[in-house]
């Protein structure tokens, strides 16, 4: 006899397993994202608990390649509230990112071009693992931001006009 599964329960479980934990919305405004890469992140236990509680800030973060390894700098993960001061982590410590060697080499080749940088875009759950999506971005000038805003406004007006008719 076939199983009569509860589709709503499985969809909810799948959504919980792929939950967004922190997002860097400012990065998409300040940079034109050319390429993205999902990486693992090396964390200690209190960092995991703080991230799952939504206590991570990616706004000022950036990534570097040092000694052939990807490193995440300047990302603030608040100390866990229930751990003592001795067992807690340093909120701004440098964290190692986990990626394949060929992916790191590809990023290094692209970073040699002028004006490109690696920025963290979001922290999310993938199953029980915390993953970080990093983006290869090119900084936007003020006039680029204005043009983008004008284009978005025009698209909104067109959609609203089409919705009326």
From Swiss-Prot:
Q: Which PROSITE patterns match?
A: SSRP (PS01317)
Q: From the Swiss-Prot or TrEMBL record, state where the protein is found.
A: Cytoplasm
**Annotated GO biological process:** trans-translation
Q: Which GO terms describe its molecular function?
A: RNA binding
Q: Which GO terms describe its cellular component?
A: cytosol
**Alphabetical list of InterPro entries matching this protein:** SmpB, SsrA-bd_prot, SsrA-bd_prot_CS
Q: Where is the composition biased (Basic and acidic residues)?
A: 145-159
Keywords of the record? Cytoplasm, RNA-binding
Q: Which Pfam family, giving just one, matches this sequence?
A: SmpB
Q: Where is this region: Disordered?
A: 141-165
Q: Tell me the protein family, please.
A: Belongs to the SmpB family.
Q: State the protein's purpose.
A: Required for rescue of stalled ribosomes mediated by trans-translation. Binds to transfer-messenger RNA (tmRNA), required for stable association of tmRNA with ribosomes. tmRNA and SmpB together mimic tRNA shape, replacing the anticodon stem-loop with SmpB. tmRNA is encoded by the ssrA gene; the 2 termini fold to resemble tRNA(Ala) and it encodes a 'tag peptide', a short internal open reading frame. During trans-translation Ala-aminoacylated tmRNA acts like a tRNA, entering the A-site of stalled ribosomes, displacing the stalled mRNA.
The record ties this protein, via HAMAP family, to: SmpB
Q: What is this protein called?
A: SsrA-binding protein
Species of origin: Prochlorococcus marinus (strain MIT 9313)
Q: What is the lineage of its organism?
A: Bacteria, Bacillati, Cyanobacteriota, Cyanophyceae, Synechococcales
